[in-house]
Amino acid sequence: MKEPKILKKIILFAFAVIVLAFIFLRNFFYEVPILKYHHVIAYCSDKPLICVSPKSFQKQMDFISRYRYKVISLEELVGALSQKKKLSYKTVVITFDDGTEDNYQYGFPTLKKYGFPATIFLISDNIG
């Protein structure tokens, strides 16, 4: 009669250890995702891997907002990492490579709508 109770306690203890280990490891090894965009344009058949439509970009930002992810700037991420601050596992960073006009024309209004910061890396050859 005592064997089932002991077995039950062992199983519950093992489950608790696994859950605690998962929580610890998730927090210990968590990395902040950096969402990197190039172009936010309606048609991009020649480079589909670096383009996203305005509608798709809107849906992605809506997902981030709806599921309460915290969007921080790249500068905030660097500061937090250098100060060894713990960030929420729902923290993300948004960046744009090249700083093309479509980033401003189509991406910026959506970012502004949600109040999301973003870092834009400009191509220096295009400046001035």
Where would I find each of the regions flagged by the language model?
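Short loop/turn segments at strand-loop or loop-helix junctions that form parts
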Residues: 36-40
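Hydrophobic membrane-insertion alpha-helices, especially the h-region
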Residues: 10-26
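N-terminal Lys/Arg-rich, disordered targeting/topogenic segments
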Residues: 1-7
